[in-house]
Amino acid sequence: DSSTSRGLGDVYKRQSHINPSREEDSSHLNDLAAVGLTFVFIVGLRRAIRTLNLFPEITEPSLKQYLDLVALGTVCDVVQLKGLNRAFVKEGIDIIAKRQRPGIEGLRSISNTSDIGVTELGFRIGPRINAAGRTGASDLGYRLLTSQSEDEVMAISERLNNLNQQRQNIEQTVLFEATNIVEDEIIEKKLNIMPNSIVVSGEKWHLGVLGI
């Protein structure tokens, strides 16, 4: 296929691509982050299993316990906090406040975060988890959020904190170099009017921070 021909290797092939903003969509779910959409799907799946009367054979899971993760993902995806997104985040923050997930507590401790709200999730907790993926250690976030071991949680939290500092340093270096390139270009071409957009590149710039 096209991805193979372009040397991209194995790429997950989706069966379909659906624009969530289609005019005929009446689900009112088009503003959900992927984590919220996944949660809605799981709720529907549980309902279907209940309809098939399978829960007498297996324990019906309580899904509310996962709303802390839904809230975290929703805030970090920077979607509009209205409707179902707002409800997810409110319920999730209430759960986080009860200190039930060791991984989140580890990050709260390492980042000196006492109060918890949208700002703390978006600027203290989330960036430390995301730093792992941006610096090539994406499994750390999963391990942290699923671990019940205090020692493992603190070890991973410290590593994520260090990776976040590393990410910030890399980001500042890239920004500094990009700014210098732009300034040199303006001087060289004697531009009096700034163009609408400027594209710069660097061979050694870390791909993990270019989207920030």
Where are these regions (language model features)?
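Alpha-helix initiation/capping motif
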Residues: 1, 27-31, 167
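Single conserved hydrophobic/aromatic residue that forms the stacking wall/gate
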Residues: 1-12
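Catalytic PLP-binding core of fold-type I/II PLP enzymes
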Residues: 6, 43, 78
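Generic alpha-helix initiation/capping and coil-helix boundary signal
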Residues: 8-9, 31, 171
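A generic alpha-helix preference that emphasizes hydrophobic side chains
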Residues: 8-9, 35, 104
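Flexible loop/turn segments at secondary-structure boundaries
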Residues: 10, 25, 206-209
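Short alpha-helices
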Residues: 13-54, 67-70
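Hydrophobic helix-and-loop "lid/oligomerization" segment in the mid-to-C-terminal part
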Residues: 47-212
